[in-house]
From Swiss-Prot:
TM segment ranges: 506-526
InterPro entries hit by this protein: ABC1_dom, Kinase-like_dom_sf, UbiB, UbiB_bact, UbiB_kinase
Keywords annotated in UniProt: ATP-binding, Cell inner membrane, Cell membrane, Kinase, Membrane, Nucleotide-binding, Transferase, Transmembrane, Transmembrane helix, Ubiquinone biosynthesis
Coiled coil: none
Gene name in the database record: ubiB
Main localization of the protein described in the UniProt heading: membrane
One cellular component (GO) term of this entry: plasma membrane
Species the sequence originates in: Pasteurella multocida (strain Pm70)
One MF annotation (Gene Ontology) recorded for this entry: ATP binding
Enzyme Commission number(s) from the entry: 2.7.-.-
Domain of life: Bacteria
Pathway(s) annotated for this protein in UniProt: Cofactor biosynthesis; ubiquinone biosynthesis [regulation]
Similarity section: Belongs to the ABC1 family. UbiB subfamily.
Cross-referenced Pfam families: ABC1 (PF03109)
Protein name: Probable protein kinase UbiB
């Protein structure tokens, strides 16, 4: 280990000790050594005893910087690993850091594009428009006579997003340490194996390295834009593919009212009721129609088009984090909500076990009662005031007590849903979430489980059956003929063995074995 690595490790341990994170460690010979270091090597005491553990953990990760902030954000989606209060605190981590030098950004962009910025752009602003842990953005304009540029783009305002320099080395150093810590956890904590810490770090590394290739964000934006092409509900800025690379992407610059600026939205004459309802509609359209949703829809990434305020349209930016759902996920989501609002907790419990996410030996009666105790108080509110996000959160928390491994994509969806609901009620406090969302849930369930869905499934399988039904009579006759031969042989064998009365148990065994083989062979021939 080099001197700089030792120094880096020292700073990380020191930060965790300052916030008393070591207090969460169980009594063990390894952890006793850590507590001894606090007094001898570091001369530190917990300076934040008045704060909750979740808050202390969040502050420590925030102080450690970008890589640790992103780790905390990822861990907040793993509610099978942490109690709700800690997961909620981690979800508050903000991915905001000081910008790096604009001249360095210019050099990075020119290296990626392979030519000076002046080749294609005018008015490049070296002062960053915004800055985060992985990248920052700058503004510019396309030149009027830039080479190989479509005429429609001449003079158009753009945003350039560029990765931070040396981010790869920073990530490698921190990941190496995270893997070491993860490998220790099963040794010092009885529950460590269930938590699978090395797998958690591996999942985090994959997500983080995905973010280091900005072409993924470009691809996400292109797909979302295509999904909502010509939609009055949502607009996604255009990506300019010829200028997009691993470390730089270039996109259309948009101007809109920040969705959090309620005063300006009112001043612009925005239909707030319709705007709030469209937020919910956009979300459920992404989930149930497209199986692909923008998963970072906090207020900083959402704007409202200034044009036609009576028919308001959202503008979404920063598509770096998206969620994908399969039919199994969508069925869980739709059936969970429908069963919950019907107060059918038995169905909720059975569904969790049937999905395979909760152990098969789970006691359904106890599981049902646990859901009832947690969810029933929610109905003290009017139906219109119930939060879908909190319903999901309650379901996850109960399931966690029964060893359910909560799927990350569903927790990502739950967090996004909370954003959307909070935003909707901020825009229009009387928003009825259930009334707005119910048509999407019902339509999807009808499409998947109704008569039309059955007819569609039959049509899809007809070519297979048409091909194989032709041979079915011949296969059946062959199988019956083979069965007759086998039956005759069994009768003969039975008579022979019956004569050997000194080995009755062996006889029974052979007869059973042969009968079993005959049945297996018949099934095999028929298939």
């Amino acid at each position: 280990m080099q001197i700089k690595d030792i120094s880096h490790l020292y700073n990380i341990i020191k930060t965790f000790l300052l916030y008393g994170i070591d207090e969460a460690l169980p009594q063990h010979r390894y952890t006793r050594a850590i507590r001894c270091w606090r007094k001898t090597l570091f001369w530190l005491r917990n300076q934040h005893k008045d704060k909750t553990f979740g808050l202390r953990l969040r502050l420590a990760l925030q102080e450690l910087g970008p890589v640790w902030i992103k780790l905390g954000q990822m861990l907040s989606t793993r509610r099978d690993l942490f109690p709700p209060d800690i997961a909620d605190e981690l979800a508050l981590l903000q991915d905001q850091v000081d910008p790096f030098d604009g001249k360095i950004a210019r050099a990075q962009i020119e290296k990626a594009l392979g030519a000076p910025l002046e080749t294609w752009f005018d008015e490049f602003n070296e002062t960053a428009l915004a800055s985060a842990s992985i990248a920052q953005v700058h503004t510019a304009k396309f030149k009027q006579n830039a080479p190989h540029l479509e005429n429609r783009l001449a003079g158009k305002e753009v945003v350039l997003k560029v990765l931070r320099p040396n981010i790869q080395q920073m990530i490698n150093a921190d990941l190496s340490l995270m893997y070491k810590v993860a490998s220790w956890i099963p040794r010092i904590k009885a529950e460590g194996r269930r938590l699978r810490p090395v797998e958690v770090v591996r999942e985090y590394e994959k997500n983080l390295r995905d973010e280091l290739d900005l072409r993924r964000e470009m691809a996400n934006a292109i797909q979302l834009r295509a999904n909502f092409e010509n939609s009055p509900m949502l607009y996604i800025p255009e990506m300019y593919k010829q200028f997009c690379h691993q470390t730089v992407i270039v996109m259309e610059r948009i101007y809109g009212i920040p969705v959090s600026n309620i005063e300006e939205l009112h001043a612009n004459g925005t239909n707030m009721k319709l705007l709030a309802e469209r937020g919910v509609q956009v979300f459920f359209t992404q989930v149930f129609r497209d199986s692909f949703f923008h998963a970072d829809m906090h207020p900083g990434n959402i704007f409202v088009n200034r044009a036609h305020p009576d028919d308001p349209q959202y503008i979404g930016i920063d598509c770096g984090i998206v969620g994908r759902l399969n039919d199994h996920d969508k069925r869980y989501l739709a059936e969970s909500f429908v069963a919950f609002f019907n107060r059918d907790y038995r169905r909720v419990a059975e569904m969790h076990v049937a999905s395979g996410w909760t152990p098969k030996d789970t006691n359904i009666d106890d599981f049902e009662q646990a859901f009832r105790e947690v969810c029933e108080p929610i109905f003290a509110k009017p139906l219109s005031e119930i939060s879908f996000g909190h319903v999901l959160l309650n379901l996850f928390n109960v399931a966690r007590e029964y060893n359910m491994e909560v799927q990350p994509q569903l927790v990502l969806l739950q967090k996004t849903l909370l954003y959307i609901e909070g935003l909707g009620r901020q825009l229009y406090p009387q928003l009825d979430l259930w009334d707005t969302a119910k048509p999407f849930l019902q339509k999807w369930l009808d499409e998947q489980m109704g008569i039309k869905a059955f007819t569609k499934s039959v049509k899809q399988k007809l070519p297979y059956w048409r091909e194989h039904l032709v041979d079915l009579p011949e296969n059946v006759m062959d199988a019956l003929a083979q069965q007759k031969i086998i039956a005759d042989e069994l009768i003969h064998l039975n008579r022979t063995l019956a004569k050997k009365r000194n080995i009755p148990h062996f006889t029974s065994f052979i007869l059973g074995l042969c009968t079993g083989l005959a049945i297996w062979l018949l099934i095999y021939l028929l298939s």
